[in-house]
Amino acid sequence: MLKALFLTMLTLALVKSQDTEETITYTQCTDGYEWDPVRQQCKDIDECDIVPDACKGGMKCVNHYGGYLCLPKTAQIIVNNEQPQQETPPAEGTSGATTGVVAASSMATSGVLPGGGFVASAAAVAGPEVQAGRNNFVIRRNPADPQRIPSNPSHRIQCAAGYEQSEHNVCQDIDECTAGTHNCRADQVCINLRGSFACQCPPGYQKRGEQCVDIDECTIPPYCHQRCVNTPGSFYCQCSPGFQLAANNYTCVDINECDASNQCAQQCYNILGSFICQCNQGYELSSDRLNCEDIDECRTSSYLCQYQCVNEPGKFSCMCPQGYQVVRSRTCQDINECETTNECREDEMCWNYHGGFRCYPRNPCQDPYILTPENRCVCPVSNAMCRELPQSIVYKYMSIRSDRSVPSDIFQIQATTIYANTINTFRIKSGNENGEFYLRQTSPVSAMLVLVKSLSGPREHIVDLEMLTVSSIGTFRTSSVLRLTIIVGPFSF
């Protein structure tokens, strides 16, 4: 009895001695745990609460010792070796921590979980037991405190795959992308994850099998406003002629060519996607549709001017011959030089005709005729020479345009003195050798001179029109002459 008591006391002493020698202060915890100053121990971090969208692809997040698991929403959970229960799937991304969870065996061994979950370290898990069921995987584990990290720098800890011990004796993630220990292809981008890594395709590419292939953004409308050009890993937008890309590099806006680079020679009008040039009056667009060429209006029509058309840059003007003036821009009107200026002497009278003027003597009477106050040349009865001559001669002047249309009444002759019981007859005494005129009697005392052949000027034509007066009983016979000077102008206006 005394021997047993002695052994017991010795054992207690040894235990007490060992506890005293191995006392170590713990203030740091492994990944997945944090120090609880109240309870003075490491406690598990619920990543399902603090990690946004911890699980992807419709998986549910279940907290795990030192990490978390991503499980199908229909997975079953066995708690403390009880029978499986169908768990109502929680909302995506919500916490589902429990003492027993369903997971694939590969999850527990590798530490990398589908959908993003991971197990922090083997020491923290405290040795979970994985069993495969018919429709589920069962992890049976004994809850254990996480491994605390001693302050002794020489102390070695065991880290999960994808982690390594740091100089502060904590498990830290291995950056496989920086270390070059990943197996991503040359056309892929390595993305470091906690405890692992992922191979992604660069922007503009998508994974097809094990390769990254270009995404043809142009087949996914509406990227570009007008035209899309696909390039390896990207794309760019183009605009049709007359448009340019806006600041967003997507929308096409109209280019105002009239403001930016006006190519029009005269007038520019901007339209959507293009522009048009117009010319001022008197010009027309050339074949290049940009420059303007003068329109030779004089060649387009022969009826613009009455006499002569003169082309000028952008316009035209009309000219008239000497003796005429331009009226209403196109018509020629005779200038009456007798009213403005003339070179006739005092003993001459000025006679205006179409296109000019002429000076005639104020006293045209020739011997034996004498001038009367009525401007008539009368042959005195007392003069024997007058017996075979017309009793009187009257001088008249008229002007007609060249090439006047025929037949045309041009002059009327009428008796100034009417005698009773007399008969008057009219005839062309001279000046009608070529038959240009015809005298038509219109009444017993008058007749009309008719132009029957066109006359071209400039020329002067003198016609003697005679009126014979005979008494009805034949007692006397007399003759009077009207000497008509017809001046034909040089033009038809």
Swiss-Prot record:
GO cellular component, one term: extracellular space
Disulfide bond keyword on record: yes
Signal peptide extent: 1-17
MF annotations from Gene Ontology: calcium ion binding; epidermal growth factor receptor activity; epidermal growth factor receptor binding; growth factor activity
UniProt-annotated glycosylation sites, renumbered to this chain: N249
Lineage top rank: taxon: Eukaryota
Record keywords, A-Z: Calcium, Disulfide bond, EGF-like domain, Extracellular matrix, Glycoprotein, Growth factor, Repeat, Secreted, Signal
EGF-like domain mapped to chain residues: 26-71, 173-213, 214-253, 254-293, 294-333, 334-378
Main location: secreted
Annotated spans, Mediates interaction with TIMP3: 259-493
Tagged with keyword Cytoplasm: no
Classification via Pfam families: cEGF, EGF_CA, Fibulin_C
Compartments it resides in: Secreted, Extracellular space, Extracellular matrix
A single BP term in Gene Ontology: peptidyl-tyrosine phosphorylation
Cysteine pairs bridged by disulfides in the record: C177-C190, C184-C199, C201-C212, C218-C228, C224-C237, C239-C252, C258-C268, C264-C277, C279-C292, C298-C309, C305-C318, C320-C332, C338-C350, C344-C359, C365-C377
Subunit structure: Interacts with ECM1. Interacts with TIMP3.
Family (UniProt): Belongs to the fibulin family.
PANTHER family in alphabetical order: FIBRILLIN-1, PA14 DOMAIN-CONTAINING PROTEIN
Function field: Binds EGFR, the EGF receptor, inducing EGFR autophosphorylation and the activation of downstream signaling pathways. May play a role in cell adhesion and migration. May function as a negative regulator of chondrocyte differentiation. In the olfactory epithelium, it may regulate glial cell migration, differentiation and the ability of glial cells to support neuronal neurite outgrowth.
Protein name, per record: EGF-containing fibulin-like extracellular matrix protein 1
Originating species: Macaca fascicularis (Crab-eating macaque)
Lineage: Eukaryota, Metazoa, Chordata, Craniata, Vertebrata
